[in-house]
């Protein structure tokens, strides 16, 4: 098996996005701006509902792919584009490709 050398470990920084959702961002920071094609890699995890309840107002998804992997807990993803919702639970993965 080929060994891969770790060149750099990037520490996630506290950030907020959308309507003030608190998160930790590791890709999409100035320290990791050389990583391509990723735009962002975020971790959401809080027991405080106020950290995430505001959500993300309508925003464009054209030409992107989202990957969501739930390590623990559950949440409901509501799409403003398609008027659909999906509940995710622990150890599930969701991949959505937006090509329109």
Language model: regions and residue ranges:
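Hydrophobic alpha-helical membrane-insertion signals
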Residues: 1-24
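Glutamate identity and glutamate-enriched acidic tracts
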Residues: 5-8, 31, 43, 65, ...
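Conserved metal-binding segment of the jelly-roll/cupin
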Residues: 87-100
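Histidine-centered active-site/metal-ligand motif
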Residues: 59-61, 77, 97
């Amino acid at each position: 098996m080929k060994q891969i050398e770790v060149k750099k470990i990037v520490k996630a920084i506290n950030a907020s996005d959308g309507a003030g959702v608190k998160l930790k961002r590791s890709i999409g920071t100035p320290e990791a701006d050389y990583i391509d094609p990723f735009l962002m890699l975020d971790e959401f995890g809080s027991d405080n509902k106020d950290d995430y309840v505001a959500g993300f107002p309508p925003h464009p998804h054209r030409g992107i792919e989202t990957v969501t992997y739930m390590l623990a807990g559950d949440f409901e993803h509501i799409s403003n584009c398609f008027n659909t919702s999906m509940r995710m639970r622990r150890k599930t993965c969701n991949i959505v490709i937006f090509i329109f």
